[in-house]
Amino acid sequence: MEHHSILRVISKLLIPPIILYALYVQWHGDYGPGGGFQAGVVFAVAFILYSLVYGVDALTRIVSPRLLHAFAGIGVLIYAGTGVVTMLLGDAFLGYNALAHDPVHAQEWGIIVVEFGVGVTVASVMMTIFIAFASHNPPLKDEDW
């Protein structure tokens, strides 16, 4: 898509607000609809859009599959680690009340940390799945349309 300058400009204009919206959904998730899963998908969509315009190779130069696998594992560790910490502090798995002296603050912090782990994992896995499928197909040429 070297000569599709309109797509390139529009994608450069859209990708930053998409990432910003993903961050909003992530950090607003404990107050309303949203959270880690939704934010992870929206965050991955920004990178998938980049890949659709510039190619899968351009995406893998920015975010390597190895890094995506690491982030997927880190997200799961954040989620599970939060549960283990609450158990070590004497509460149930993901019993957030053990995280702070005030139950309201403990619930907020627990949800934020767990949703962050979910968001990291979902974004990484979505991009990994996209790269796996997109890299096996021959690229479409403009002449084929």
PLM features per residue range, with description:
Residues 69-85:
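Hydrophobic alpha-helical membrane-insertion segments
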Residues 30-43:
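Short, non-helical or kinked segments that cap or interrupt transmembrane helices
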Residues 12-29:
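Short, hydrophobic/aliphatic alpha-helical segments
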Residues 55-60, 83-98, 128:
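Transmembrane alpha-helix boundary signature
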Residues 45-51, 114-128:
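Hydrophobic cores of alpha-helical transmembrane segments in multi-pass inner/ER membrane proteins
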Residues 5-7, 42-66:
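Cytoplasmic juxtamembrane interface segments
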Residues 134-145:
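Cytoplasmic juxtamembrane regions at transmembrane-helix boundaries
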Residues 101-116:
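Short aromatic-rich membrane-water interface segments that cap or initiate transmembrane helices
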